[in-house]
């Protein structure tokens, strides 16, 4: 698929290499087929230059979301793309800063410039909930509805794979509660060459405790409004968090795909932000979870004010979240 008609042209396969022409900034997924899709690659051409920002936690953090065009606060071009945990292929986020329950992902087009849809797997069977199907069907969001009570993974519960994004032991901690394992780039890691999905502790400085917070004064955010105080006046469809004493970065609230219904939660666009890490989440709360390295919201599903931020929580692997890469 391509994010705009005519974005990709001249696709050829020769001597084991794929060549193509790209007309301008945007996103695309190019696949090689032998009847069925054998493999696919995400092509990302942002408007702004990708760069790294140093952080208090010691990681060099990418300056925009994976798949974003730039990182301008209050601009939908900052949303980027959404990923089910462990999958390499993305889904489009909302086309507008805010949305409704009827909002679907931004339009995408096939090689003939016809609009195509992100579809979902069966909600009554897990027959297609396997890695081979995921690779062969990059535009299908895999639902966990049929196994929701036993696993929140998009893979069948007995096929769950903690190593998909390169950090199978990433949940292990020491006696001072520090994460022991940082992981490494994996075969299915969606980040560009030289970058990878971050470990669980990458944004622990974003709250005073390093954990769940519901008081804005406990968020390590930039004073965007310039009024000398931390408040919702500093929120612009996302927060600008301080990565270090000298660097901050905007993290947009691009919402997410719900893993059970395998559809974009469009009404939460601009209100909820969720970002994946590379580590599995301990199974004592629920099976099929992974670490979210950043989750925040300013309203609940009923539209009531509910301001929270968590830099290390659990999420369902079937949900599709944003990704903020770090330098390898």
What is the role of each PLM region?
Residues 29, 68, 151-328:
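C-terminal, surface-exposed recognition/capping segments
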Residues 1-185, 281, 317-319, 327-328:
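Short, compositionally biased
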